[in-house]
């Protein structure tokens, strides 16, 4: 009786099953990594847009309380800006206010690029604005 050399059909099937399982796990990892890279790219671009939007506030037009909104990159990023006087918690409410004194404004910028809660950035900053920059004569 001769001994057969080679692999049996069951051994080949088991090898293919293990290979398929390994490829499935590998592709799942690559898919997750690609999703994380895409999310990091969107977050980085949103941060750059937010910095640019905040940098130009008060440059072309005087900074006044109100709301603005818009979109960037063909609507991929949507932003809204809320400008309001800063409410100083330690300020005495009865203290007289000099109309020619500079005003502190709080800018709240929200940049969104999706519907998920982690697909938005919220920036808050303060700007000191002179009375003449607000349109009030000094």
Swiss-Prot record:
It is found in: Cell inner membrane. Its main location: membrane. It holds the Pfam family N_methyl. The keyword Transmembrane applies. The modification N-methyltyrosine is found at residue 7. Keywords: Cell inner membrane, Cell membrane, Membrane, Methylation, Protein transport, Transmembrane, Transmembrane helix, Transport. Cleaved by prepilin peptidase. InterPro entries: N_methyl_site (IPR012902), T2SS_protein-GspI (IPR010052). Belongs to the GSP I family. PANTHER family: TYPE II SECRETION SYSTEM PROTEIN I-RELATED. This is Type II secretion system protein I. It comes from Xanthomonas campestris pv. campestris (strain ATCC 33913 / DSM 3586 / NCPPB 528 / LMG 568 / P 25).
């Amino acid at each position: 009786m001769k001994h057969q050399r080679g692999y049996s059909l069951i051994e080949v099937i088991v090898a293919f099953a293990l290979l398929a399982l390994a490829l499935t796990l590998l592709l799942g990892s690559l898919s997750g990594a690609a999703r994380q890279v895409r999310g990091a790219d969107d977050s980085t671009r949103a941060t750059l847009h937010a910095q640019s939007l905040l940098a130009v506030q008060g440059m072309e037009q005087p900074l006044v309380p109100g709301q603005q909104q818009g979109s960037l990159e063909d609507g991929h990023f949507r932003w809204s800006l809320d400008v309001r006087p800063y409410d100083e918690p330690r300020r005495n409410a009865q203290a007289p206010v000099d109309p020619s004194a500079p005003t502190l404004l709080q800018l709240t910028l929200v940049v969104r690029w999706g519907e998920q809660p982690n697909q938005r950035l919220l920036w808050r900053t303060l700007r000191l604005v002179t009375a003449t920059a607000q349109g009030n004569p000094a």
